[in-house]
């Protein structure tokens, strides 16, 4: 018999179920009072049905392994407060009742599960909810930093101007700060340190999951889909010194991968790794995906997605892929992999199932190299044409991007040769050291008109290349108008002006340029994922491009037939120019 985990409202009360290796006590909270009720269990699953308990009741659990630790239901839908790190959370035997959020009994969402609006080839717009809206002048101050702000007419108008097909929300489920951040006076603002996989962080949705449902509906009515970035590779319980908040307290050996010596596997760089080879872990992941599908979202981006398919190594036929494909709620959703982790054999670009899209860092790096001046035109052409060397000769599954939340913003890419992460408190050691960036002669801000012109030309060349590329493309919020993080390429802990999108002084000329690119791409069907039917590659002098010319060529021209017209893409590194044009084909008689 299948088990309905979490808190399920039934006639006259609520039914609770949780998985645990040791006996569990249900804790019901009424203001400061706590009522403890032993649960009954079999085969590691513990149950209780309590009369008179209904929607809005607050609860938690205590497991016999350490009853001092209040634990959050892994299947919780709503929490009464955010997580805040405290050293006591990781100390065995110390009571954490005052430190841990309570779950709130909440009915599941039931939005219509319509087909996704997003189709491959469209523009994905990656954003951080807080960072995107905290400084938005048109959003009411009380609404800034929340999911509801994304439904504001001014936000939707901006997205429509760019022809955004779907926004991709960086993690929204409840997370906790890494333990080194509070002593530095910093907080994690990106959310890639989740505790439970379904409950939205109360800072982003004070009214709970209903706010996500309403925002998704508003965006869908404007023709914009929503993709959620979900983290199923680790949790914020971290390493052996980390906090005990949920899974660790219930059954550490079940949920987390361990080496033969009993130590935690760390293929994520965060201290622990979820063991997705276990059916119980996959059931939790699938439960989260179904929950958010019922909120109306188009699909999901999987952080460090190689973890999903790890045995000891990566298995392209791992059970979770078939389970997602067979699920009636999930089979039609958009699935996007970040196709790597830091474990052995973790880099798996091109190896995910045929219906999954994949972040293509080869595209990012080859385009950057070309415009920096040390890459080949041949590699650039391969990336623009859909990366058939990675995804095969058919429809491409690439997600092309130049910048993402990790790394430099696009404006910083052409303004800084080195990272400047001192504000993160790690002596500038964190973040990637090799960014394939360049500063155009001066590190950081410059008032020199010539340098500013070169940087502007580089930005336009990069952006035009992106919008001319075959396959799905992704733009990170603010890159369309020159957002800077002051050279910080790892702004995960900058919940301040460094990490927030600055709207007032944005480069409106660049923004208009990107809007024009988006319009040209849509009008001329450059968003195709199918292979080019009739591609004519030319050197800049008009001659046919030959294999021996690709490596040292300063650019090329690609001509694509489109009915009675021809689309021409001309890339010239010497002049820092990308030209896109449509012209009528004149037949000679």
Regions found by a protein language model. Give the residues of each.
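Conserved, mostly hydrophobic/aromatic
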Residues: 18, 61, 127, 169, ...
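Substrate-binding/active-site clefts of carbohydrate-active enzymes
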Residues: 128-297, 305-326
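Conserved alpha/beta catalytic core and glycan-binding cleft of carbohydrate-active enzymes
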Residues: 76, 89-93, 99, 104, ...
């Amino acid at each position: 018999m299948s088990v309905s985990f979490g808190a399920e409202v039934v006639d006259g009360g609520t039914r609770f179920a949780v998985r645990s290796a040791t006996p569990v006590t249900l804790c019901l909270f009424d203001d400061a009072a706590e009522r403890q009720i032993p649960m009954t269990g079999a085969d590691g699953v513990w149950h209780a049905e309590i009369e008179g308990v209904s929607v809005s009741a607050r609860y938690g659990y205590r497991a016999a392994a350490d009853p001092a630790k209040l634990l959050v239901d892994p299947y919780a839908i709503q929490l009464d407060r955010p997580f805040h790190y405290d050293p006591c959370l990781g100390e065995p035997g110390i009571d954490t009742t005052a430190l841990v959020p309570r779950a709130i009994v909440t009915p599941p969402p039931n939005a219509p599960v319509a087909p996704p609006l997003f189709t491959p080839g469209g523009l994905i717009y990656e954003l951080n909810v807080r960072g995107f809206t905290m400084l938005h002048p048109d959003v009411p101050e009380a609404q800034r930093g929340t999911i509801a702000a994304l439904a504001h007419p001014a936000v939707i108008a901006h997205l429509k101007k760019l022809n955004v097909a779907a926004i991709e929300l960086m993690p929204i489920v409840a997370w906790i700060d890494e333990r080194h951040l509070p002593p530095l006076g910093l907080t994690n603002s990106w959310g890639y340190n989740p505790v439970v996989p379904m409950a939205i962080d109360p800072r982003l949705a004070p009214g709970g999951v209903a706010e996500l449902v309403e925002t998704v509906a508003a965006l869908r009515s404007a023709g914009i889909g929503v993709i959620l970035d979900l983290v199923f590779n680790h949790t914020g319980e971290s390493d052996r010194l980390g906090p005990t908040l949920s899974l660790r307290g219930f059954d550490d050996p079940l949920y987390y991968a361990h080496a033969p010596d009993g130590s935690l596997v760390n293929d994520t760089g965060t201290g622990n790794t979820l063991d997705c080879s276990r059916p119980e872990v996959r059931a939790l992941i699938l439960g989260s995906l179904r929950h958010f599908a019922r909120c109306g979202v188009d699909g999901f981006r999987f952080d460090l997605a190689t973890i999903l398919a790890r045995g000891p190594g990566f298995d392209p036929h791992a059970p979770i892929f078939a389970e997602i494909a067979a699920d009636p709620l999930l089979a039609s959703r958009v699935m996007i992999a970040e196709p790597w982790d830091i474990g052995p054999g973790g880099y798996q670009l091109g190896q995910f199932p045929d219906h999954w899209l994949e972040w293509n860092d080869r595209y990012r790096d080859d385009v950057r190299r070309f415009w920096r001046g040390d890459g080949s035109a041949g590699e650039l052409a391969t990336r623009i044409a859909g990366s058939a060397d990675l995804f095969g000769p058919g429809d491409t599954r690439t997600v092309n991007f130049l910048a993402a939340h990790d790394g430099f913003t696009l404006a910083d890419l052409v303004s800084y040769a080195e990272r400047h992460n001192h504000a993160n408190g790690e002596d500038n050691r964190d973040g990637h050291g090799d960014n394939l960036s360049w500063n155009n002669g001066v590190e950081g801000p410059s008032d020199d008109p010539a340098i500013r012109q070169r940087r502007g030309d580089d930005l336009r060349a990069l952006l035009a290349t992106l919008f001319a590329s075959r396959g799905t493309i992704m733009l990170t919020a603010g890159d369309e108008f020159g957002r800077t993080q002051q050279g910080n390429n790892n702004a995960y802990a900058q919940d301040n002006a460094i990490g927030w999108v600055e709207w007032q002084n944005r480069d409106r000329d660049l923004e208009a340029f990107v809007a024009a690119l988006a319009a040209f791409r849509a009008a001329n069907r450059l968003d195709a994922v199918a292979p080019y039917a009739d591609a004519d590659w030319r050197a800049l002098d008009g001659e046919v491009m030959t294999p021996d010319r690709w490596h040292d060529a300063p650019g090329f021209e690609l001509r694509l037939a489109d009915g009675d017209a021809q689309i021409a893409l001309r890339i010239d590194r010497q002049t820092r120019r990308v030209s896109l044009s449509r012209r009528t084909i004149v037949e000679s008689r």
